[in-house]
């Protein structure tokens, strides 16, 4: 498995680039970060935009590196009044298969927001979701700087 290790500086630069893209065409009301991987990018985006309306959802799909459940399990949800009629920026670290993003986006859309757009630091060609905003496009397994330990130490 090919691995791409991203350093803090590269991720921060990517988030700034993504924010420049977002500023051009999307004036969102609420940021929703997907736990765990999307939380750091979501917090960073909230500071860059000075948008304190940051919510989180938890969805679990991967059990371990390359090991998935049958489908994503959404274990922490939102209240309808938090997103009703609002423009949502859904943030995650990576659109890998895209299955988690689809499940979370469909859940949010069921709460009647005005619009939901997706921002991810990295996207893979196999993803069934084409994010509205992304910077890195790769088919490699990505290790972000906030992740516990490199793949080699997990075996």
Residue ranges and their predicted role:
Residues 1-155:
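PRPP-associated nucleotide enzymes
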């Amino acid at each position: 498995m090919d691995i791409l290790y991203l350093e803090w500086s590269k991720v921060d630069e990517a988030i700034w680039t993504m924010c420049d893209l977002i500023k051009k065409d999307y004036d969102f009301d609420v940021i929703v970060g997907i736990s765990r991987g999307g939380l750091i990018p979501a917090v960073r985006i909230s500071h860059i935009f000075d948008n304190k309306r940051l919510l989180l959802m938890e969805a679990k799909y991967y059990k371990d590196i390359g090991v998935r459940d049958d489908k994503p399990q959404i274990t922490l949800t939102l209240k309808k009044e938090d997103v009703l009629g609002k423009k949502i920026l859904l943030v995650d670290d990576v659109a890998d298969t895209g299955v988690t993003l689809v499940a979370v986006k469909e859940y949010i859309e069921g709460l009647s927001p005005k619009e939901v757009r997706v921002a991810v630091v990295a996207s893979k060609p196999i993803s069934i979701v084409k994010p509205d905003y992304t910077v890195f496009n790769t088919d490699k397994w990505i290790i972000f700087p906030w992740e516990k330990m490199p793949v080699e130490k997990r075996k």
